[in-house]
A protein has these predicted regions:
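Transmembrane-cytosolic junction motif
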Residues: 65, 94-121
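Charged, low-complexity intrinsically disordered regions
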Residues: 123, 129-131, 136-178, 183-340
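Cytosolic juxtamembrane N-terminal segments of multi-pass membrane proteins
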Residues: 1-41, 125
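Membrane-helix interfacial "entry" motifs
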Residues: 28-36, 40, 71-79, 83, ...
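Hydrophobic alpha-helical transmembrane segments
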Residues: 62-93
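Canonical alpha-helical transmembrane segments of integral membrane proteins
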Residues: 38-64, 89-93
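Membrane-interface amphipathic/juxtamembrane segments adjacent to transmembrane helices
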Residues: 6-15, 108-130, 134
Length: 340
């Protein structure tokens, strides 16, 4: 997937605007904040080391008689000793202060970075591609509905909601779902990393329907933490063996679900198994689907290296691909016979 020549022209014009440059500089300042703090501590240590070297050298020269003892030298040594004492105390206080307040500042910095990137960088790029689109940085996609299409986890981190503002009311977010193992060597366990989409349900599909991917290990089938049967629901199979091997289907209205799962839809789901780990959920108002691809599409640079390698055209292509995938799913739904 690539950008058209017109899109490239607009994207590069956007990058040269004063507002974009100011926002990018602000992002760079946020990302280099920790590095500046490190430079501050290193500078203090170097100054302290220099004071010890100078003081030690002066004492040696005085002891050897190379420098004469005088009131001036005595005053200089006293001032140097006071400076060393001040630097030691100041360094200790700085370390304690950073230990107490640094983690809180770091969390605020990450929040500020995400909001600034989405509002000032990502949103203008998105609007070049889709003029009516916007990014909601204040709200999350409904957690109750997100849980229907991603594996269960302790923590869920969403990006801002990218809204296309079209007739489908298409919305999408980056989502990272993870848990933290307990014990001496605790670490994060990733359950989902990808995109979750939501569109208005205009299909005559009654009740709830959930389709989740399965995995096989030692002839045992698992569904990787995805939810199973919903209240007043049941698990069903279809006549297609391949589909039954790769997906579990749960619904509350079997007749409506079987009508929806036409050969066209089943064939499409089967074609996705080699390219995507797709999950699907619908109720009578909205449809949700998730693409587990182990990638962030909308995330801000996280460090100096990712800032250095960030490219505006690559970011625009990722945005286009995210909505291309949503369009692919939407087209499949509306091509299904009996649905419009």
């Amino acid at each position: 997937m690539d950008l058209s020549s017109e899109e490239k022209k607009k994207i590069n014009s956007l990058r040269r605007t004063a507002q974009f440059q100011r926002s990018w500089k602000a992002i760079r300042n946020i990302l280099t904040w920790k590095e500046r703090v490190q430079h501050y501590f290193i500078g203090n240590m170097l100054l302290l080391f220099l004071c010890f070297i100078v003081g030690g050298g002066l004492i040696l020269l005085l002891d050897e008689g190379i420098l004469p003892r005088s009131d001036f030298m005595n005053g200089l040594m006293k001032h140097l000793a006071r400076l060393v004492l001040f630097l030691v105390e100041f360094q200790i206080l700085s370390v304690l202060f950073y230990a107490l307040f640094g983690p809180g500042w770091e969390a605020k910095r990450r929040t500020k970075l995400r909001s600034l990137y989405e509002r000032e960088i990502l949103a203008p790029i998105l609007q070049v591609l889709y003029p009516s689109a916007q990014i909601d940085t204040e709200h999350d996609m409904s957690p109750n509905h997100v849980n229907e299409v991603v594996p269960s986890a302790e923590h869920y981190i969403q990006s801002g909601i990218l809204q296309l503002n079209d007739e489908r009311n298409l919305q999408t977010v980056d989502l990272y779902a993870y848990s933290i193992t307990k014990g001496k060597d605790s670490h994060d366990v990733t359950h989902f990393l990808g995109q979750v989409y939501s569109i208005k349900n205009t299909l005559p599909l009654r009740g709830e329907l959930r389709i989740v991917p399965t995995e096989h290990f030692l002839n045992m089938e698992t569904q990787g933490g995805y939810l199973g049967t919903m209240q007043c629901g049941k698990k069903i199979d279809v006549e297609d063996i391949k589909h039954n091997e790769h997906y579990n289907i749960y619904c509350t209205d079997e007749q409506s679900t079987r009508k929806f799962l036409s050969p066209t839809v089943i064939e499409w789901f089967n074609s996705m198994t080699s390219r995507h780990k797709l999950s699907f959920y619908s109720n009578e108002s909205r449809i949700y689907f998730a693409n587990y691809n182990n990638r962030y599409f909308f995330a801000a640079p996280k460090d100096k290296e990712s800032l250095r390698t960030w490219r505006i055209e690559e970011t625009a292509i990722q945005l286009k691909y995210a909505f291309y995938f949503a369009n692919e799913v939407t087209e499949m739904l509306h091509k299904n016979e009996g649905f419009s």
